[in-house]
Amino acid sequence: MLRAEVLTGLPPDRILHDLNQLAINDLDQSHRFVTLFYSDYDPRTKKLRFANAAHNPPLLWKSSDQKIVKLDAEGFVLGLQKDAEYNCSEIKLNENDLVLYYTDGVIDTSNSLGERFDEERLIKTFIKLCKQSYTSQEILNKIFKKLDDFTGQNRHLEDDASMVVFQLK
């Protein structure tokens, strides 16, 4: 479904709207839903367009400002509300900006004391790594290492912990 929608070239909010209509039919009576953050990047304009269906907002490291911006746009989960609306936002990216996309399994991971890794800890880790000018792959490796260190040897994930780092060169 997603691939077919992406190939239409529609803006992110329209893609989420169409996916929601399809999900309502597929998930009807299942009491399930989907969260999704969708973005597309235009290398000519250096603009990242995005829409959000109640997913964790990615973290944008603005290299020039040395600060984090949460990429969020209003939107309801997919598959529950037929008339759900989604907003499309866009932001211009600059050289050395990085975007961290992540699932809730990353911030919901807990240690032996029951403490969650949480978004604040992820943001602090991401800022520290960005300031040290690591590559996107090094950042991923170091965040996963931090998660492993945090959870200890008895790591048990309740949910997937997935991440992608997009770096503009």
Report residues per predicted region.
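Active-site-proximal, acidic helix/loop segment immediately C-terminal to a metal-coordinating Asp/Glu
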Residues: 1-9, 69, 93, 97-154, ...
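A residue-level signal for conserved active-site and pocket-lining positions in enzyme catalytic cores
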Residues: 78, 160
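Short gly/ser/thr-rich secondary-structure transition/capping motifs
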Residues: 31-32, 80-85, 145
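Active-site metal-binding loops of divalent metal-dependent hydrolases
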Residues: 56, 105, 161
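Catalytic core of PPM/PP2C metal-dependent serine/threonine phosphatase domains
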Residues: 1-66, 72, 86, 151-158, ...
